A protein has these predicted regions:
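Conserved beta-strand signature within the Rossmann-like core of class I S-adenosyl-L-methionine
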Residues: 129-136
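A short glycine-rich, Lys/Arg-flanked "PGG" loop and its adjoining helix->strand segment in the class I
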Residues: 116-128
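Conserved class I S-adenosyl-L-methionine
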Residues: 1-37, 39-48
């Protein structure tokens, strides 16, 4: 049993979390996919239920779904009918393998002090010109939700400065109102960047 409340949440609630109904707009994913070559290789970091991977696969992309929770990976495998790699972000050790990396609502659990290393690993794993997408719950300081899950809650200014300092190019940030599993109104921060 993990002593990390965030990891424990996903272990203990994998089936409920994976089964929840998510009807998210596809505009961001469609824009991400449209910028990639046909049959591009995509790494999904934190695939959860596998919903996004399923959509990308249905569009003809070569997707490698991953999740840090073995229990959520099993749920995604049921949905996808294919293996899902159990991998924590800090285990990413690839060099110029992927055309795109998709991290929807997953890197928001990485401690701020660890984000530079994770962004470096993602940058290294992308091919030259590769595209990165991530989303975060916006804020000004680290904190926890009512389930005890850790969030890094970055601001757009803080996040853009960090990515720029690490060598990312063509960084775009957008914000949108939304929600999350906790049912609370949420300001979401969406990031797109290129290697």
């Amino acid at each position: 049993m993990s002593t990390d409340p965030t990891a424990s949440f996903y272990t203990d609630n994998a089936a409920i979390y994976a089964a929840r109904e998510r009807r998210l707009p596809r505009q961001r994913m469609d824009a991400f996919l449209a910028a990639l070559p046909a049959r591009a290789t995509i790494l999904e970091l934190g695939c959860g239920s596998g919903q996004d991977a399923a959509y990308m696969l249905s569009r003809g992309f070569d997707v490698t779904p991953t999740d840090g929770s073995a229990e959520l990976a099993k749920e995604a495998e049921k949905h996808l009918g294919r293996p899902v790699r159990v991998m924590r972000f800090e285990a990413l050790d690839a060099t110029e393998i992927f055309d795109g990396i998709w991290a929807e609502a997953s890197l928001l659990h990485v401690p701020r002090s660890a984000l530079p290393d994770i962004f470096d690993r993602i940058l290294r794993a992308l091919k030259t010109g590769g595209i990165f997408h991530a989303s975060f719950k916006a804020g000004e300081a680290e904190g926890h939700d009512k389930f005890g899950r850790y969030y890094n809650y970055p601001s757009a200014v803080w996040l853009e400065a960090m990515l720029s300092a690490r060598g990312w190019k063509n960084i775009t940030m957008t914000e949108a109102d939304g929600g999350g599993f906790d049912g609370e109104p949420t300001k979401w921060l969406y990031v797109a960047a290129h290697k």
